[in-house]
């Protein structure tokens, strides 16, 4: 099943970051995007996740073109079907880690998975305010929140950037298990080529073009 389709999208920020980008994301599929710092990887992820509008071309989610969706429909998709993991985490600072997860629990109507908390090693700090947590702990809370939400597509920008190798490997196992069990898809941006090649497909953003290398 096709979850996302990008057709000939381009975007400029002071200069053209990427041009004529096209690809598709299918159910149970993981795609990694690599490239040099400043190549436009994160901007591309923002366009694909509807946070930015492409200058040209189109993005479709679940066979519906974003540009023709009603605001109500797009808002519903963002709330329920898209999971975003970015380097800034976007956690609610006044809340505890558990309260941050409860926001996703309400959206998905699923119980918070205690095993998930254990595997991400955040069970012991779950009642603490997120401002008291380290960067790595905040990142793991952000990952747990997205998986609790149970989105159809995960967009992840350097999701293992603040984690040690053992924890990073466990996070990737969680992602791949989730994609398989829920029929979801994931687009991941990373500078780590070893991590990228764990995904089904790898694209490199270079000289404004997106090239499939795996």
Language-model features, listed with the residues they occupy:
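ABC ATPase NBD coupling module
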Residues: 66-83
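Conserved ABC ATPase "signature" region
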Residues: 65, 110-125
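Conserved ABC transporter NBD signature motif
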Residues: 57-65
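Conserved catalytic motifs of ABC-family nucleotide-binding domains
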Residues: 150
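Helix-to-loop junction immediately C-terminal to a conserved catalytic motif
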Residues: 49
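Catalytic Walker B motif of ABC-type/P-loop ATPase nucleotide-binding domains
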Residues: 154-157
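Conserved ABC ATPase signature
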Residues: 129-139
